[in-house]
Amino acid sequence: MNKINAAITAVGAYLPEDVITNDDLEKMVDTNDEWIMTRVGIKERRILRDKNKGASYLAIRAAQDLFDRHGIDPKSIDGLILATNSSDYHFPSTASIVAHEIGCGDIFSFDMQAACPTFIYALEVGANFIRSGRYSKILVIATEKMTAFTDYTDRATCPLFGDGAGCVLLEATEEEVGVMDAVLHSNGIGKDHLIMKAGGSACPATHETVDNRWHYVYQEGQVVFKHAVVDMCNSCVEIMERNNLSHDDITWVVPHQANLRIIDAVARRMGVPYEKVMVNIERYGNTSSATIPICLWEWEHKLKKGDVLVMTSFGAGFTWGAVYVKWAYDGSTVR
């Protein structure tokens, strides 16, 4: 039997229409456009303002975009993996809601949560389902309503986050394309540096936790920045060395869009010219696990069959890693 690979054969995304600019934030907290642009490189971010709609709504819209533009029948999907750090509820899973709403029938579906790298974790998990030979099509969706957990009185974190969703379809192939390798790491030393302190079983919601604003994202920015630069760079070098890839072999670097200075550092360490790096943080901010698939969606028409992509991310925990992908189709042919 020939080796089965897991190819990305379609991408989709959805970004809410409403925008929060740096000028808008200047009216809420003590900040300004120059301060935000200098430190993180974000000009604006999208927000899903409807309080009755959660991450599932964004995921549904992203999946529908993929189905519509690529002519995919939802009933052909074997399983759905949903990457999110902002699920609709603790239970039921957001994946089960999405699978039902997009018309996939009674397929298996589950949520994954590994902070901002959740998408690359989910991509490797989905690829292994395909490699097992038991499944032909796995839909991987990353969806985040991060603004629901953003404290708009905190000048350090409120400029960072935006809402959005992106997705990819993994399909079985015998060609030498698809998810070729992944390096995934975690280390709990960073637990207290990037955290939502309350709402889980270790610290259930009380009047005190609400009053202390512990249900919003808390981040020690300088600590997180230093670890992100080192770990994202090291994971990229690790996957390049494991697969004998030089900087000349790489067509595109797809970094997590958390901070423009981190992205710059990764590109320099890899020796890749900046024109090969996907960057859209200025317009969308940090959509957590959704940043990488949103980049793939936005660059789809530039991607060609055989292109070599290295995706890398870092997040709470700490968690980090990189994925090596050979692109499976010419994006210019997609409507």
UniProtKB/Swiss-Prot annotation:
GO cellular component: cytoplasm
Main localisation: cytoplasm
EC numbers, comma separated: 2.3.1.180
Swiss-Prot/TrEMBL keywords: Acyltransferase, Cytoplasm, Fatty acid biosynthesis, Fatty acid metabolism, Lipid biosynthesis, Lipid metabolism, Multifunctional enzyme, Transferase
Active-site residues annotated for this sequence: 116, 256, 286
Chemical reaction(s) catalysed: malonyl-[ACP] + acetyl-CoA + H(+) = 3-oxobutanoyl-[ACP] + CO2 + CoA
Keyword Transferase tagged: yes
Stretch list, region ACP-binding: 257-261
InterPro entries found in the cross-reference section: ACP_syn_III_C (IPR013747), ACP_syn_III_N (IPR013751), FabH (IPR004655), Thiolase-like (IPR016039)
Location in the cell: Cytoplasm
Pfam families, per the entry: ACP_syn_III, ACP_syn_III_C
GO molecular function, one term: 3-oxoacyl-[acyl-carrier-protein] synthase activity
Gene3D superfamilies: 3.40.47.10
Biological process, per Gene Ontology: fatty acid biosynthetic process; secondary metabolite biosynthetic process
Subunit structure: Homodimer.
PANTHER family cross-referenced by the UniProt entry: 3-OXOACYL-[ACYL-CARRIER-PROTEIN] SYNTHASE 3 (PTHR34069), BETA-KETOACYL-[ACYL-CARRIER-PROTEIN] SYNTHASE III (PTHR34069:SF2)
Family membership: Belongs to the thiolase-like superfamily. FabH family.
Domain notes: The last Arg residue of the ACP-binding site is essential for the weak association between ACP/AcpP and FabH.
Chain's role: Catalyzes the condensation reaction of fatty acid synthesis by the addition to an acyl acceptor of two carbons from malonyl-ACP. Catalyzes the first condensation reaction which initiates fatty acid synthesis and may therefore play a role in governing the total rate of fatty acid production. Possesses both acetoacetyl-ACP synthase and acetyl transacylase activities. Its substrate specificity determines the biosynthesis of branched-chain and/or straight-chain of fatty acids.
Classification via NCBIfam families: fabH, PRK09352.1
Name the UniProt record assigns to this protein: Beta-ketoacyl-[acyl-carrier-protein] synthase III
